[in-house]
Amino acid sequence: MFLKLLDKLGRKKVVLDRGPSHPRFDLAKPWMNRYYLIFRHRPKWFPFNILIHEMLADDHGDGVHNHLFPYITIVIRGGYWETTKKGKFWRRPGYIGFRSANTHHRVDLKPGTRPMTIFIAGPFGLRKGPRSESVSYTHLTLPTMVQV
């Protein structure tokens, strides 16, 4: 009900799995529902924002990415696999993760699930280095996966 209210207030954004500059934008599909609890368009000078993320699909491709800012993520529904340089970990409800802007990761969902998180974005401008790495951590096999 709360999410429906946010939608009616114009606080929901459906994020697609590719942007309009992508050569196959015609194949774009919903990737995440994003609900803004504070700013729909956060000013660069404001130090944080709070959002609810409802994940609809795995992160794109095989590589990993980071964010423009440090962040905190709190899993409030479902769960997901997070792959980092340290391995592949199950993030269950109640999990709280603190990440720097330089932490590369990817998120993969269990089929048929729609995990939800509270996402607290920190200040802009703290990332050093590239946004993504084409490096794939898919070589991590089940024995290296850890449930946290």
Q: How should these model regions be labeled?
A:
Residues 1-49, 85:
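A short, N-terminal "cap"/entry segment at the start of jelly-roll beta-barrel domains
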Residues 51-66:
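Conserved short histidine dyad/triad with adjacent acidic residue
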Residues 68-81:
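Short, conserved beta-strand element in jelly-roll/cupin
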Residues 82-83, 104-110:
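Short beta-strand His + acidic residue motifs that chelate non-heme Fe in jelly-roll/DSBH
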Residues 85-102:
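Short acidic-glycine-tyrosine-enriched beta hairpin
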Residues 113-128:
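A short hydrophobic beta-strand segment most commonly corresponding to one strand
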Residues 138-144:
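Conserved small/polar residues in nucleotide/adenosyl-binding loops
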